[in-house]
Amino acid sequence: DTAQTANWRTDPAVAAGGYFEDLASHGLDLMLHLLGDITLAQGIRTNQQGLYAAADAVTGTWQFASGATGSGYWNFGAAQALDAVTIHGSQGEIHFSVFGEQPVVLRNAQGTQSHEIAHAENIQFFHIENMQKHMDGLVTHPSTSHTAQRTTWVMEQISRPPF
């Protein structure tokens, strides 16, 4: 964000972690859902652009309980917006976007498969509807206070000062 306009996401009094606090939780929550608990996380955050008070660049590294490692980089002042996740495995890789309507691409020894997953027009509606069904005991929703706490812990570890 290089607009230099007042924005709750860039005001540390409202959102201490800036855009990272608002947006990174979604991708990190998805990583926890797909790959399991993260047991170690650390990071670096800084304000490179000086356009607002919150950090605009964050780098994080983490380790899953399985031993797999991961890393992420969020730069909210970059010239080009990029929303991409790549999971590299011993037999191939999967590539997808957290927010964008990009195809999910699987590459392995058998070739490349690409799948379009259209976003619902009102994605929050289905999330809220399924949370209500969860609270009524009708279904088990994958997003709970426990998963939110895990994601928050990872973000706090990435965001905290190194010393």
Regions found by a protein language model. Give the residues of each.
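Anionic-ligand binding region
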Residues: 43, 57-58
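NAD(P)-dinucleotide binding in Rossmann-like oxidoreductases
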Residues: 48-55, 65-129
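Acidic/polar loop patches that form or flank catalytic/metal-binding clefts of enzymes
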Residues: 37-43, 69-71, 94-95, 141
